[in-house]
């Protein structure tokens, strides 16, 4: 509790909030208009107040490494890079990236990103995020029917996954940085993400009620089934993989559980999170994911870093918590 109270006291000072003490990660709200720190460590943390910026931001997405975020700012929706360093939060305009991004995706290692604009249906691949970010490639998707629902990009910035929906139909496209594109054999894709450092992807198919890993999607791809309807999945919300690609994590739309599939041991474990899952959002640590948003109350976090995965409930800082922290009381 000492860790939490130390950090809460820092956020209780007058003026813009600063980042002090250990941070488990950051939370962007549903519209990406706010970014809140998760102060503390696993098992002893709290969701802090939103960080203050000079102007409003939108569409914010936090890097899996929790060291930066991408967002849009201003009337022209310029793309900005927000560095989330200890005691320093800086915002920089990315002049090399066209304004107007409606969707932003960051790769599993945070080395590449992609943006998409609905009105002209242009996808932009962004690389060199750790140095001077630049637009490495842009793709015109105006001849692809439907509206883009989800976007993912590989760590090397070479491939992007585009999930388009038109009525009841969905298609999952692969676009490469050399301009080629093709459709993956998925009936009704609902979620897809790349594995770290690879051109492999974990994909959810709602029509087939299946989650599978597709290896080498830019070559002669092979398909490995991970979970199917018989395993109890219905309406898949999100999928993710561990850093080594040996475990797959699945959340669904209709149940308050998260499922962990060990590909080596061919074992499946379901944990009740008692939450409305908004996805699998990486936090600091090995296989640690945020499952829900502060807008729905306390935040559920999956800690799968050990042999016995657990669900941790992280409270949200309130005015009373801040007031009590000034008085030195522990919550």
Locate the predicted segments by residue:
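A short beta-strand motif characteristic of beta-propeller blades
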Residues: 45-52, 89-96, 134-142, 178-185, ...
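Short beta-strand elements that form the blades of beta-propeller/WD-repeat-like
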Residues: 23-29, 66-72, 110-116, 158-164, ...
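Repeated scaffold domains used in trafficking and secretory/extracellular systems
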Residues: 14-16, 55-65, 98-110, 143-153, ...
